[in-house]
Each structure stands twice: as structure tokens, then as C-alpha cells.
């Protein structure tokens, strides 16, 4: 039985050089950094299959992995269970994500332990870490995670296999139109429309076990797995800056409905407080959230 007092990680995952690289680039510059989390016993195939079976249905997502870069809506399901998908991931042509792993006791301290190593650099720039979460991705050989964006600050740690994560500039409306940002923050999907002429503007990050990449808030990206099974861990967090950017998008949606063409929220260090406050006031008065 696992000792409840045992540390989740027994040594630092991010060494001083990696922490310095992160501090210099955060929160807007995507970059690679080294980590020492490979071969963790909680992150092997059988352990993850059991985790997937233990998580509530809303915390697992799995579907076909033999996809194009761009898809219209959610990809199709495979007909397998989450346990079958992960245990047979080498042959199922699938992609699976286990969400909010911190809700399970054995995994509760893992995202916190890793983010704790980076807390000083994070809080010096964007203040308190909010809504810290962990996500595990298990992918078949050559699987594709289609083009999308995410609202969190994100570090993706590669644990097994290889993949290429290709990022595009965050906040550039060529790659994610303002109207799509606005609809996402009001409950729309995170999938984005792909055009082949985007490719020259992307920055590919080749990842092998022991390497990680930082993905800024709402930076469009897609992922292509290598020729072997891949396991990756995302540790994510929100900040008051990221929430203000999202709420400013909500305000812009209201302005757009009035026939205006509002300016997009500024990227860090712009604070977007006026529009964020206006949206929060509107939301409170109308019961939006």
C-alpha cells in the first residue's frame, strides 16, 4: 500500500537551469525545458488505465487519433472503454486524456508538487496560481490532437515516446479569430478552423521523454505523435491575468452585438481591467455566472 506520507516526487523535477529558463520566458514566450519525471510509477500504462476507470465520466475523454490537423467539432468515439483504450493504446489508433487527476488521492499532490517548484517565477509575474490542475494524455503511434487552444497557462511534460507540438502566436487573430475567442469563453468549443497556409507561421517543438514545453494562454496549437506510444502530463494553472483576458473577451462580445468592432484584449502585461470589470458587472446583474 502506498504510504500516505510519502512524497509524490522524491527529487526536484525542474533543475535550476530549467527554472531559470522558465522564469525568463513566462508568461508569453513558448519554450522547451528539461524535466526529471520520466518513469514515475503513477504514470505507467496500467496505472493510468486504472486511473481512467476510477475517474468520473466527465473527467475522461477518448476518441480516434487518426485525424487531420483540423476537425469540425469533437472527433468521433472509438467504441472502446477508457481502460481498453489505454491498455491497448499501441493498436487502437486512439487519443485519451485523463482530466483533473488531482481529484484522486494517489495523484492529488502531483500537479501541486511540480508547480510548487515554479511558484516563485509564476507569482512574480502573474500573481497567485489559481485553479491548478493536471491532465494526462495517452496517444497511439502517429495520433493527432487537432488544432485548438486552451485557457490555461500550460507546461506539457513528455514522459514516454515522442511528439511534435506546433504552436502559433497567441492573440494573433489570423490563427484564432476574435469571434472564436469570444464564443469559447461563453461556452463554445476550443477546436479551431485549420488552414494549410498557417503552417509556415507555426513553431514546432520536438519532445522526447525528459523534455517539456510551455504553452501560453490561448496559444493555438496541434500535436502529432511519433512512431511509438506517447504519454504526456500537462500541469496547468490560471491567473488573475488570464481570467481578466477571458472576461474582456466577454465584454467584447457585448460590444460586437451592439454593432461595434472592439479591440482585442491586450496580451501580458496589459491587464484588461476595464473591460473585465464591465463584463463581471454585467454577468452578476444578469446571472450569467
Predicted regions and their residues:
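N-terminal auxiliary "cap/dimerization" subdomain that precedes the catalytic jelly-roll/cupin core
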Residues: 1-95, 287-288
